[in-house]
Amino acid sequence: MKTETPSVKIVAIAADEAGQRIDNFLRTQLKGVPKSMIYRILRKGEVRVNKKRIKPEYKLESGDEVRIPPVRVAEREEEAVSPHLQKVAALADVILYEDDHILVLNKPSGTAVHGGSGLSFGVIEGLRALRPEARFLELVHRLDRDTSGVLLVAKKRSALRSLHEQLREKGMQKDYLALVRGQWQSHVKTVQAPLLKNILQSGERIVRVSQEGKPSETRFKVEERYAFATLVRCSPVTGRTHQIRVHTQYAGHPIAFDDRYGDREFDQQLTEAGTGLKRLFLHAAALKFTHPGTGDVMRIEAPMDKQLKRCLEVLRSKA
């Protein structure tokens, strides 16, 4: 069965949308439409800018008028998000802050930030389903699927540019909380170890410390000690894939329930202690940045979920 958009749509390009390629713009306008179809309608000249045919690499300018034709899409593509409607609804409950420029949410553990790698649903797809009227919603940064906590989304292209610049210039501070094995030594305040990313034959990404890798630095502070574990605050100076997880492992203190870099005996200890923990104990607790619209310095905190809180309560009772 096919569905069809009702009519031709004319979109006027705002100043903060200028500079992006027409193919990327169409992907935000025609949600759920395959890239192959977008390139097909461009190639056929069905998409016009200022009544003229354009190439996929054309960069939009402020004031351009884009003609978007009705697009037929297989119903299954239109409804790709439908099995995840409960997750979409749940996203509305974890929004921490929102204005005209940004949206900040407390990402649940187990939800990917975007679809891909066999996943049809991610936070960004969920937000677009939740806010179908939004013209622009893009991730500013990423969190691993099993990591929970503060996730920043831009609602304007100008906001995305500003926040990406802050990331590049190290003007954004991220604080994570991690439960690690054993007693973290207080004098270990920084781990500097270059990280190299490898792709296994299975397609799985694995990161290891290697002199051939990229320079990487994480700062650590002990928050609380327990009988056989430590809660540490981790502040990455660089932003490498799996950085905190690999740096804690390298320091001899892997994170609880880390299926890639963890320690099964430590996980078993936590299970036997009755903590009820079944997920990676890595939580993006706070994010400090300069607001792209007002210039104000903001610090947004995300509370831990019930599972993490209960785990710490049990460990405190046994300390």
Swiss-Prot record:
Which Pfam families has this protein been placed in?
PseudoU_synth_2 (PF00849), S4 (PF01479)
Could you tell me which Gene3D superfamilies the record lists for this protein? Pseudouridine synthase (3.30.2350.10), RNA-binding S4 domain (3.10.290.10)
Query: Which EC numbers characterise this protein's activity in its record?
Result: 5.4.99.24
Report the transmembrane regions from the record: none
One of the entry's Gene Ontology molecular-function terms is: 23S rRNA pseudouridine(955/2504/2580) synthase activity
What class does this enzyme belong to in the EC scheme?
isomerase
The protein's matches in SUPFAM superfamilies, at most eight in alphabetical order, are given as: Alpha-L RNA-binding motif (SSF55174), Pseudouridine synthase (SSF55120)
The record places domain S4 RNA-binding at 20-83
Q: Which InterPro entries match?
A: PsdUridine_synth_cat_dom_sf, PsdUridine_synth_RluA-like_CS, PsdUridine_synth_RluC/D, PsdUridine_synth_RsuA/RluA, RluA_PseudoU_synthase, S4_RNA-bd, S4_RNA-bd_sf
Keyword Isomerase in the entry? The reply is: yes
* Known catalytic reactions: uridine(955/2504/2580) in 23S rRNA = pseudouridine(955/2504/2580) in 23S rRNA
Write out the GO biological process terms.
Answer: enzyme-directed rRNA pseudouridine synthesis
Keywords for the protein's UniProt record, in alphabetical order: Isomerase, RNA-binding, rRNA processing
Is RNA-binding found in the keyword set?
yes
Free-text function comment from the UniProt entry: Responsible for synthesis of pseudouridine from uracil at positions 955, 2504 and 2580 in 23S ribosomal RNA.
Q: What is the protein name stated in its UniProt record?
A: Ribosomal large subunit pseudouridine synthase C
Q: What is this protein's gene name? A: rluC
